[in-house]
């Protein structure tokens, strides 16, 4: 699912994309943007409150996902506006079967994941750090514009794990909602309630991969836990975006 610089250029040129912001491929030097949902500690460490791992991250270190870094006691995301995978897919490929059926979805992902599934289909990007992959500068405004140019009525955050590029999903979804291009999130559901509720205010649909029905499987095969995922299902249902579950 990784894209080389040449393939990225082909996608964008094929779209006839005249983006207002310049599009540049980069590797090895991810840009830092302020992260949301974390707590500062007196020691200079931070505690990430984005997902149930609640990583305690010392200065100069990263969380388990590999895409969020403590710099001088402040937490930053290293993947904001910097997708490493970009494609146009049928929405059923997500899979979402009952939300805008028959539509083409502008689909994107960044590096990183908060799970380490032994059976991951997209491990080439989900289990990599951002500096290990080529990516492009594609801010939310450009994402929505590109979706319109490609005549995609929906934007899908997919392939890796949208939870770890929370800020990018949030801003794309908010802008897309304003401009009539809904966003959907294809997720493992391993996220804290507060950031999930924030996303649900903007998302058109959420699809959760329910990988198993037991804690041992989640712990041993995914590096996560089942209970927070079940809590996510209840929260999404209560917040009212369209919800689909794939087992």
Identify what each model region corresponds to.
Residues 1-15:
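N-terminal secretory signal peptides and thylakoid transit peptides that target proteins
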Residues 16-22:
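Hydrophobic h-region of N-terminal signal peptides that target proteins for export
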Residues 22-57:
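C-terminal segment of N-terminal export signals and the immediately downstream linker at the start
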Residues 46-67, 111-123:
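Local cysteine-cluster metal-coordination motifs and their immediate loop/turn environment
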Residues 70-205, 214:
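Conserved Radical SAM active-site core
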Residues 135, 220-228:
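Alpha-helix N-cap and loop-to-helix initiation/capping positions
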Residues 227-247:
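Conserved C-terminal portion of the radical SAM core fold
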